Amino acid sequence: MDKSESTSAGRNRRRRPRRGSRSAPSSADANFRVLSQQLSRLNKTLAAGRPTINHPTFVGSERCKPGYTFSSITLKPPKIDRGSYYGKRLLLPDSVTEFDKKLVSRIQIRVNPLPKFDSTVWVTVRKVPASSDLSVAAISAMFADGASPVLVNQYAASGVQANNKLLYDLSAMRADIGDMRKYAVLVYSKDDALETDELVLHVDIEHQRIPTSGVLPV
């Protein structure tokens, strides 16, 4: 074998890949494929659950019933002394209340603690007599009778506890928008005084669509 043949043979040997060196996937490749599959499934889930005019997302957690949307009220409780109570009737905007016969299916309250929140509060929603002045004594009795679900919201290091929502189903009661003034959100400050800069309540009322609801709620 002359020198040129020897050089060519050496070059061919160098070009021959080692067995399995390029075919075996790395752990990074495997992780990337798993991540891609997860993202694909997530995109499909999000696409299926995106709100539409007929199916707006109810309080960012689930779809409204077909033919329903929701209106929102934001409540900021005043200072509540330790062991005392606060109550506020549900007063919807005039643009909604003029359709007072539209049915209401659910009320959901989201408790949003502000950065200074370090207390324990009990929150509920109740139908209260028109004659009630929502005094401390009256609200105390409503919390004690066990007639409505109560959400207990406590300080959490993350700022918001895992379960910060209370859902009140009115479907069986055939309640309508006009009835909402008969309902009130009630708050009990258990451990110490609740200051004005500690808590915000977001109340979402799911009701039949009304002519003014031509766009998705925010």
From Swiss-Prot:
Q: What is its main location?
A: virion
What UniProt keywords apply to this chain's record, in alphabetical order?
Acetylation, Capsid protein, Ribonucleoprotein, RNA-binding, T=3 icosahedral capsid protein, Viral nucleoprotein, Virion
Report any Pfam family annotated for this entry: Cucumo_coat
Q: Which InterPro entries match?
A: Cucumovirus_coat (IPR000247), Cucumovirus_coat_Asu_sf (IPR037137)
Keyword check for Cell division: no
Tell me a GO cellular component: T=3 icosahedral viral capsid
- Biased composition, Basic residues: where in the chain? 11-21
Write down which residues bear the modification named N-acetylmethionine: M1
One annotated GO molecular function is: structural molecule activity
Q: Where is this region: Disordered?
A: 1-28
State where the protein is found: Virion
Describe the task this protein carries out.
Capsid protein. Probably binds RNA and plays a role in packaging.
The record's comment on protein family reads: Belongs to the cucumovirus capsid protein family.
Q: Cite the domain annotation text.
A: The N-terminal arginine-rich stretch does not seem to be the major RNA-binding region that allows formation of an infectious ribonucleoprotein complex.
Please state what the protein is called: Capsid protein
Classification from the root reads: Viruses, Riboviria, Orthornavirae, Kitrinoviricota, Alsuviricetes
